Amino acid sequence: MDAIVAQLNIDMIGRNRDDKASESNTVYLVGSDRISTELHEVNRAANAGLPKPLSLDYEFNDPADLEQIHFRSDHYSYAAKGVPIIFFTTGLHPDYHANTYEVSKIEFDKLARITQLVYETGVRVANLDHAPVRDNKGPRAGRHTE
């Protein structure tokens, strides 16, 4: 575990939250600032460098979020051991864990843009001459969008 400097997790990135067209540019980030604010800043810089930056939303990162998504996905076992993480998601939708999910509902352009952001973030982390600083400042409360 000591050799792992960060964990980037993607889950449910091909749809818009609640299938709202207004969410077509949004990706929700969870945990990016909880363990390492440096990792958070690396991700923000990677997004700013994209040809078409995404709207970064931290609503699900709020400790008061009722869904408690920070504790519900594959990244959490790393975070619990102190590894800086970012969970990229587009939120829940009507077909979440249902048999009504169809390929025709996937927003492939959005999926590709988010995947590019994850890649660019990973490359920037890999090219650091140090592991992202683990300052453990914790999440920012409230909804934040960039």
Each model region followed by its residue ranges:
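His/Asp/Glu-rich mid-to-C-terminal helical/loop segments that flank catalytic regions of hydrolases
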Residues: 89-146
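Metal-dependent peptidase/peptidase-like ectodomains
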Residues: 1-87
